[in-house]
């Protein structure tokens, strides 16, 4: 009976990790005057890939307190997607510009209306702090294109998992 109880708890713990990888909503980290946010993590979005992208997502600040994903369509594969960055996607080798935003995340209950980020997006659990405005762009090698990453804070998930492990092996 004790083994069965531990097996059930392990399955519940596994389900916790599986279902915690859901949709997220993002809040701006903005230490500028008037900001109400203090903590955040970093998201990097690559705007170009080996083949020209005709649509992509970018984080956009609406009320200086929150960020939302906005989908931009660009059939000509060149143009201005925000006030500080222009891109020119070409099928030939080139350097890729990156835009960095610093955000924190909380799981949201409803799915966003915009399309998801590229299928090869990765989620990491590192955090840092800075302003929410885009930083100066760095050129990255062409081979690192076609990947976007969103860095989210997973501390609450790991705390629940740790507590579950203590409960699991403590009884």
Swiss-Prot record:
Polar residues bias spans: 109-118
The keyword tRNA-binding is assigned to this record: no
Example of a GO cellular component annotation carried by this entry: side of membrane
Glycosylation sites: 39, 95, 120
Propeptide: 145-171
UniProtKB keywords: Cell membrane, Glycoprotein, GPI-anchor, Lipoprotein, Membrane, Signal
Disordered: annotated segments: 109-145
PTM comment text: The GPI-like-anchor contains a phosphoceramide group, rather than a phosphatidyl group.
Compartments where found: Cell membrane
GO MF: actin filament binding
Lipid-modified residues, GPI-like-anchor amidated serine kind: 144
Annotated coiled-coil segments of the chain: none
Homology family: Belongs to the ponticulin family.
Descriptive protein name: Ponticulin-like protein E
Name of the gene this protein is made from: ponE
């Amino acid at each position: 009976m004790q083994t069965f109880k531990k097996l059930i708890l392990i399955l519940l713990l596994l389900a916790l990790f599986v279902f915690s990888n859901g949709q997220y909503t993002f809040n701006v980290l903005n230490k500028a005057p008037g900001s109400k946010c203090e903590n955040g993590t970093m998201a990097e979005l690559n705007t170009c890939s080996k083949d020209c992208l005709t649509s992509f997502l970018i984080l956009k600040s609406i009320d200086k307190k929150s960020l939302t994903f906005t989908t931009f369509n660009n059939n000509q594969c060149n143009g201005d997607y925000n006030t500080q960055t222009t891109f020119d996607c070409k099928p030939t080798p080139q350097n890729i510009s990156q835009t960095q935003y610093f955000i924190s995340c909380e799981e949201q209950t409803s799915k966003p209306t915009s399309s998801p980020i590229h299928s090869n997006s990765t989620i990491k659990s590192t955090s840092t702090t800075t302003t929410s405005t885009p930083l100066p762009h760095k050129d990255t090698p062409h081979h690192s294109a076609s990947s976007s990453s969103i860095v989210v804070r997973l501390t609450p998930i790991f705390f629940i998992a740790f507590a579950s492990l203590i409960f699991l092996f403590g009884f």
